[in-house]
Design a protein with these regions (language model features):
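Hydrophobic alpha-helical transmembrane segments
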Residues: 110-117, 144-195
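Interfacial segments at transmembrane-helix termini and the short loops linking adjacent helices
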Residues: 40-41, 100-116, 255-256, 321-341
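Membrane-interface junctions at transmembrane-helix termini in multi-pass inner-membrane proteins
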Residues: 6-10, 66-76, 121-148, 168, ...
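Interhelical loop/hinge segments that connect adjacent transmembrane helices in multipass membrane
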Residues: 1-5, 9, 140, 144, ...
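Signature of the first transmembrane helix
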Residues: 8-62, 93, 150-154, 226-255, ...
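Helix-loop junctions and terminal segments of transmembrane helices
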Residues: 57-76, 135, 264-293, 299-305
């Protein structure tokens, strides 16, 4: 029978790049919509919700996707990753609720934080299925999911905010959008992958369970936690490093200034998404080169990745220097452009 043939690294990168470009563009579009339909305070509330939930979710995710995609020797089944992710996500949501109440956030702000936490929980489950597709270099299907999620999220946020005039209904639309993509596309990706490998006469060891059900074997879960815990801690610290300025900014100056800061800073986030797409596409190939002791191919690919990332960074700096103020005026509002100095 024919063996499974992965799509080329170039096509994987193309799919991932296009998917992440559309998704990051739509995320940026959410800030634009809130800036156009609302005000900087509304942008600030949304940003605060992301800032409060991010460290908790980053820690609870334990970077399982990276471990999953680089598990070239299949030490764990997909079901193990899914089982652990459900446990950690189930623990993260009450922690977000406790932080929201303990820090004194009330009313609209508290509701937005909790809703964003729930949306991030749904996203974390999708992330395990993305890891499965990425591990087997099926980036096209993962990219399609992201390309559907981005525009649908933007549409639902826009409709909810426009009709109600409140960010709460906009964020609720975001939750609905992410739940729909998880149920109609991401979860069925497991069966799609099984069917694809079955038709090609090859079932990888990582899909040995044949069902997309979580597996909770205490010994396996414990080993996976100890393996991934350092990565989770590092990602939490990275998230805190990025978000602590937002906490202090909101506390000392208010949500308006936080909203302006978020709008300006998102241009950097958009650039990081492109670099992330590059790394995501190449990571499984790098892992195989490393596991196969192919040092020459590993170093060549790594050098190419670094060169592309540097070129993208320099391009972003040039655009900001030449037309930063004009871009902010057109995309957001004139009041945002005065902060370019």
């Amino acid at each position: 029978m024919p063996k499974n043939k992965n799509i080329t690294l170039r096509r994987n990168f193309s799919w991932t790049f296009i998917g992440n470009l559309i998704y990051s563009g739509c995320q940026w579009g959410m800030l634009v919509v809130l800036a156009k339909l609302g005000n900087p305070e509304m942008v600030g509330t949304f940003t605060l919700g992301l800032a409060v939930t991010a460290p908790v979710m980053m820690f609870s995710n334990l970077q399982l996707r990276d471990i999953q995609t680089t598990d070239a020797k299949n030490h764990y089944l997909f079901n193990d990753y899914l089982g652990l992710r459900l446990i950690t996500t189930g623990l993260a949501l009450p922690i977000i609720l406790w932080i929201t109440l303990a820090t004194g956030y009330k009313g609209e702000t508290a509701i937005v934080i909790i809703l964003i936490g729930f949306a991030k929980g749904l996203e974390s489950i999708s992330d395990v299925f993305y890891g499965l597709l990425q591990k087997h270099e099926k980036m096209d299907r993962m990219a399609i999911s992201v390309m559907m999620k981005g525009p649908l999220s933007l549409l639902m946020l826009s409709i909810g905010t426009y009709i109600s005039g409140s960010i709460i209904w906009g964020v609720l639309g975001l939750v609905i959008a992410w739940a729909c993509i998880l149920l109609i596309w991401d979860i069925p990706s497991y069966r799609w992958l099984i069917n694809k490998f079955t038709s090609e006469g090859e079932i990888p060891d990582s899909l040995e369970g044949r069902t997309a059900k979580p597996r909770w074997q205490l010994g396996t879960i414990r080993k996976l936690i100890w393996l991934s815990l350092p990565l989770g801690l590092v990602m939490m610290l990275i998230s805190l490093n990025a978000n602590i300025p937002r906490y202090f900014l909101e506390h000392s100056l208010g949500k308006k200034e936080l909203g302006v800061f978020a709008a300006l800073a998102y241009l950097i986030v958009a650039g990081n998404m492109v670099v992330s797409a590059l790394g995501s596409a190449a990571r499984p190939r790098l892992a195989k080169y490393y596991a196969g002791a192919n040092v020459s191919a590993y170093q060549t690919l790594l050098f190419q990745l670094v060169a592309i990332a540097c070129l993208l960074g320099l391009s972003g700096i040039l655009v900001a220097w030449v037309a930063g103020g004009q871009i902010l005026t057109i995309v957001y509002q004139p009041e945002y452009a005065k902060y370019t100095d």
